[in-house]
A protein has these predicted regions:
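Short, well-ordered surface patches within globular domains
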Residues: 57
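Extracytoplasmic cell-surface/polysaccharide-interacting catalytic and binding patches
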Residues: 1-51, 61-154, 162-175
């Protein structure tokens, strides 16, 4: 997602990165999420948009949103960043057998209330999301939760492997 300028920053943030990386603990859990999805829908697969993120990239993201209404969607690097900066968070969705992402109501990286998971029934009721899109989000959360990940309330695509406190105690920040 950040290897192209088609993201909320409008910039390429990863020049030569072609693969996503996670801390092994999170990667093993993600394998379990993929297995859970395959048990339910054998033709579906998880698709990763972002995973481990160096603090240098976090600073670039923060500089785009600081002082705007979008600041709440990006972890402040001056406060230790977020779990992406430990390799313990993943931005993810589900794709079908043709490699097409399932509709989720918004694109990944869409920083607005429509991306929040806290009132999806209201979004359906107000015509901002279809029931199919809501069910797709629920499926994603189900398989990720089963594997031990926690959803971020403001971004349907973002899942944390552990809490920030655990990350600070047990893992190393990526500079």
């Amino acid at each position: 997602m950040y290897t192209q300028a088609d993201n909320f920053t409008g910039e390429v943030l990863y020049d030569n990165l072609t693969e996503a990386y996670l801390h092994p603990d999170a990667a093993y859990a993600l394998i379990e999420a993929q297995k859970a999805l395959k048990r339910l829908y054998p033709s579906y697969s998880l698709i990763i948009y972002d995973a481990a993120r160096p603090m240098s990239v976090q600073k670039k993201m923060w500089n785009v949103v600081k002082g705007t209404s979008k600041y709440k969607y990006v972890s402040n690097p001056n406060r230790g960043g977020g779990l992406h900066n430990y390799g313990l968070a993943v931005d993810i969705s589900i794709q079908d057998s043709l490699g097409q992402p399932l509709p989720m109501g918004t694109k990944v990286d869409h920083l607005s209330m429509e991306a929040h998971i806290t009132d999806e029934i209201g979004l359906v009721h107000n015509g901002k999301m279809s029931e199919t899109e809501r069910q797709n989000r629920l499926l994603l959360r189900k398989v990720m939760k089963e594997a031990g990940f926690r959803a971020l309330p403001s971004e349907w695509w973002h899942f944390n492997f552990c809490s920030r406190d655990v990350a600070k105690q047990k893992y190393k920040l990526i500079p």
